Amino acid sequence: VTGVGSLIHIYAVGYMRGDAGYYRFFTYLNLFMFFMLILVLGNSYGLMFIGWEGVGLCSYLLIGYYIGKRSAGDAGKKAFIVNRIGDLGFILGIFTVFFTFGSVQYLEVFERAHEFEIGAGAITAACLFFLIGAAGKSAQIPLFVWLPDAMEGPTPVSALIHAATMVTAGVYMIARSSVLFSLSPIAMTSVAIVGALTALMAATIALVQNDIKRVLAYSTVSQLGYMVMACGVGAFTVGVSHLVTHAFFKALLFLGAGSVMHALHDELDMWKMGNVKKYMPTTHWTFLVGCMAIAGIPGLSGFFSKDEILWYAWSGPYGHPVFWAIGTLVAGLTAF
């Protein structure tokens, strides 16, 4: 959050220079970081929920930043409303945890979790509610529809929301609750299925997009599906590992896209771009590194995290050859 977020702030200083709402933009951006840190550093589900709602509000403000643009306002409202559906699931999960354990503090909940047998109804219910929350925030089927429209915000916002912070909050929440999810085979299988289907669907949609930012948006949805699938097959650590590596190369790709758009006077259609390497060599090489990383080229971070996910999808405690096959296909589609 702080590492990639700081780099995006530095980039945004130059990118937003001369914009009429310069100070408003950085107010929203820093408020977003504040709530994201609360979400990550809190020691209870209560604090996580405060941060969770805060980043939802800030994403609405940032996506709809261009107040004179109707499509931006509509995209902001769409993101806010769809996320409220997921938030309802999350808060129901928190209530279920509270009534089951008498506390929402992580340590107290996880210490008492072993008292319940595997497949206990209350644990399964809480985990399925958490999955609904994660589907909203991390853009999983069927609540993924808000993420591509979130491209209406300034490019640094796209980088921050899609790479470093907000959309990975759902994956973080599932991984943080791994003690509970591990006690519910139904929830684990559900998580893996939702993640696998999202990864496959988003990767196929990305293939037919012309808008450079929408390609990256659907690519993000696909990679989030990868992370969720990793958690579903029992590879929580590997899912978080891919979350971290993805934050860096996806932020790089979004900032590279912003650089290209800036040079081409906000042109988004990739078919109208060509020979940009000649005029923007630095952007070309950095973008190429980002593409190679997300494609899983050996030697780069994406290769190691994806390789581990595929291994667990095949041989993990909740793994299945179908998950491995979907993961392999999605890796190929992403590389293409």
Residue ranges and their predicted role:
Residues 2-51, 57-336:
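Hydrophobic transmembrane alpha-helices and their helix-loop junctions in integral membrane proteins
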